Amino acid sequence: MENEAGQLVDLYVPRKCSATNRIIQAKDHASVQINVCAVDAEGRQIPGEKTTYAISGFVRSKGESDDCINRLTTQDGLLEGVWSYQR
């Protein structure tokens, strides 16, 4: 919800899991939000270029968060050449 000035005034903004596209509940204290930055050829961070991933507690409890982060970053072009069991 926004006020007259256009500022966000909600107490809770729901997030979606990047891996499963499920809504992360407010009481899911096992969920994490990870920012992955883009780097240049020298390995330095490019200012302002980051991608945010939200991983739910359900995915983390199954032990699939590492594979999900690898899959998502590879799809977005941030990661190359990672071995995956699925190949």
UniProtKB/Swiss-Prot annotation:
Family designation: Belongs to the eukaryotic ribosomal protein eS21 family.
Annotated InterPro entries: Ribosomal_eS21, Ribosomal_eS21_CS, Ribosomal_eS21_sf
Protein name: Small ribosomal subunit protein eS21
Quaternary assembly: Component of the small ribosomal subunit (SSU). Mature yeast ribosomes consist of a small (40S) and a large (60S) subunit. The 40S small subunit contains 1 molecule of ribosomal RNA (18S rRNA) and at least 33 different proteins. The large 60S subunit contains 3 rRNA molecules (25S, 5.8S and 5S rRNA) and at least 46 different proteins. Interacts with uS2A and uS2B, strongest interaction is with uS2B.
Residue positions where N-acetylmethionine is found in the record: M1
Disulfide bond as UniProt keyword: no
GO MF terms, alphabetically ordered: structural constituent of ribosome
Gene label: rps21
Record-level GO BP terms: cytoplasmic translational elongation; endonucleolytic cleavage in ITS1 to separate SSU-rRNA from 5.8S rRNA and LSU-rRNA from tricistronic rRNA transcript (SSU-rRNA, 5.8S rRNA, LSU-rRNA); endonucleolytic cleavage to generate mature 3'-end of SSU-rRNA from (SSU-rRNA, 5.8S rRNA, LSU-rRNA); ribosomal small subunit biogenesis
Keywords from the named record: Acetylation, Cytoplasm, Nucleus, Ribonucleoprotein, Ribosomal protein, rRNA processing
Phenotypic consequence of gene deletion: Deficiency of 40S ribosomal subunit formation, this is likely to be caused by insufficient 18S rRNA stability.
